[in-house]
Amino acid sequence: MDIALLIKAAIMGIVEGLTEFLPISSTGHLILAGALLGFDDDKAKVFDIAIQTGAIFAVILVYWQKIRSTLIALPNEKQAQQFALNVLVAFVPAVVLGLLFGKAIKAHLFTPVVVASAFIVGGFIILWAEKRQQRNPATIRIHDVESMSTMDALKVGLVQCLAMIPGTSRSGSTIIGGMLLGLSRKAATDFSFYLAIPTLIGAGAYSLFKDRALLSMADAPMFGVGLLFSFLSAWLCIRWLLRYIASHDFVPFAWYRIAFGIVVLATAWSGVVTWAE
């Protein structure tokens, strides 16, 4: 058993879990961490997507009571049916656009300028969204996910598609997009987490199926360690974030994104990291 490889898998799992649900782009951080660890071949790229499943188990655990009650009520209660429909409607745009344009995006948009621009522009959008809600609280019209309409969900789903641009952040696009669409910070964050469940499970399953020829049973320990550490770090991160947003905004994450965008350019120009698929 390659202990060094398992340590790398654990580190990558921690990076995935800590960054997947914060509005800072897990993809950008995994690329940087993988380059620094020498863990960036084709198999590692499949690994990066597959270990998102560990983070999803963390979401399911944190929100289990809501998920369980929704599943039980689904056959009879309209509110549960509406909630499930909203998650499904929000999920569909990413599936369609991912299948249509996924290869083209990987071929043309994984460049230092695109990744850095996504980080920096995303940071300024977060600053704007937070300033907008703080200056005009009347823009908040939805305070919980149960109050969302199907059209609200579709709009958030369309915004999620922006995360196909590397460096954008799936959670960042859905949370900040939701806030700009009138959701409270808490409602936008909750819906982003619920939407992550089908989105990331689908992405992980598709990646494993598509690149199954690269994998063997010998890789099971590496994937198992990555999934475990992804789950544990994501669970801690989600619990922390839900407490954080109760009394804080996303402004610190905006400045972090801007700084990280500069790091992307610096590492690319110095040759430390190859920001390409």
Swiss-Prot record:
Enzyme superclass (EC): hydrolase
Primary localization class, coarse: membrane
One Pfam family this sequence matches: BacA
Molecular function (Gene Ontology), one example: undecaprenyl-diphosphatase activity
Keyword Cell inner membrane: yes
Keyword Ligase among record annotations: no
Subcellular localization(s) per the UniProt record: Cell inner membrane
Extra facts: Bacitracin is thought to be involved in the inhibition of peptidoglycan synthesis by sequestering undecaprenyl diphosphate, thereby reducing the pool of lipid carrier available.
PANTHER family the record matches: UNDECAPRENYL-DIPHOSPHATASE
Name by which UniProt lists this protein: Undecaprenyl-diphosphatase
